[in-house]
């Protein structure tokens, strides 16, 4: 039949439309188009009308001299792109690789992912899943399992006889000869190296530990992401020409100035936040008290294989959940988490919290540590007081306690996972780079450049504690800025 002469007309229910595009694909007459005004969970976006050039008097009020720093005045609409892509810090073309995977084009899907993310297999296991939070399908029933799809695509590549190695972007296929040093082989540093390699550089990554990986190897338990997966992803970087110099601490074994003398033109500092925050309460010096990050390092290295007795974990974030789950696997005793926040206020991702509960971790809300108790230099228990509120009316961290309501819990181990602090050593010695708050390295928010022109920063030491996907995005931005710095005009 001739579809254009059909007596039937299409009927749509706007309340059920999720902008999946299926009607566009199947309409035999090609009469349906999917425009840029995508719907959201709150309904279609209403765009304001723009002034027309011939109706505008172009005075100073229509000219923004500082447009690079205030580009919010430029009327670009993130909602014109798939919400999942907008929500992803790395801006991966999620809607694209899902479609390719649906068509069985797994190799093409992987190539699309790796344009923006060098570690899809790792992220498939530990990603924050901002994309699923924004998925429009969630307004109908539940979001697509985007992370699982990405993980499946990456697994196909890992099973392949020949791994996919991204090609260099250079039109001339000639490498840039400028030497770039990256300090820190965590997700941000390796991401920067990856995108510089794609651009045509041969970056050198300096890592003080014995192997690259940073928190992916040392800080995240192997039951969340296998170390073989991390190492497999790192091997691809080596094939791309990235050089790793492990066991070298910049600032101690070699300085930035010495590296300059060796011909390095730019530096990307991504050393993370390596020091566990302390409680600063009585008894913290007792044997059996350990920082959560130090505990995870010890577990991942194989130095700690078991714990004796009951364990108390202080903290309510994802790191605290990791610590508690790791401890549960090493002790025959109980593992209890105590945090300041109420259940609905906990900063941990719900999926991670549920995984901890499934493992047998008991979460106790609205309690703050008051003192760690001990005998003969060893932990015997902990005294806690009720936490009434965590933040003030302005949302600032300002916990309020009721010291009249306390409990004492016996235990043999106290693991503290309440945050991370900086431990830069002498990595910035001899440079103008600063840490004004004693924690993060000051930098330009767009270029990640410090007060020392050839020194750039990224990852947690620039932004504060965030997720792996945020570090990956930070590494890419750093690579772009470094490329423009060493090749003026690019």
Regions found by a protein language model. Give the residues of each.
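Rossmann-like dinucleotide-binding cores of NAD(P)H-dependent redox enzymes
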Residues: 205, 209-240, 244, 299, ...
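General small-molecule cofactor/ligand-binding pocket signal
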Residues: 204, 243-247, 290, 362-364, ...
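Rossmann-like dinucleotide/flavin-binding elements
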Residues: 182-206, 246-256, 275-277, 294-350, ...
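Short beta-strand to alpha-helix junction loop
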Residues: 138-146, 220-232, 246, 250-257, ...
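Ferredoxin-type iron-sulfur electron-transfer modules and their immediate structural context
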Residues: 1-176, 227, 269-286, 361, ...
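A conserved short coil-to-beta-strand element within the FAD-binding core of flavoproteins
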Residues: 246-262, 366-378, 387-390
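Short gly/ser/thr-rich secondary-structure transition/capping motifs
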Residues: 8, 158-166, 247-250, 291-298, ...
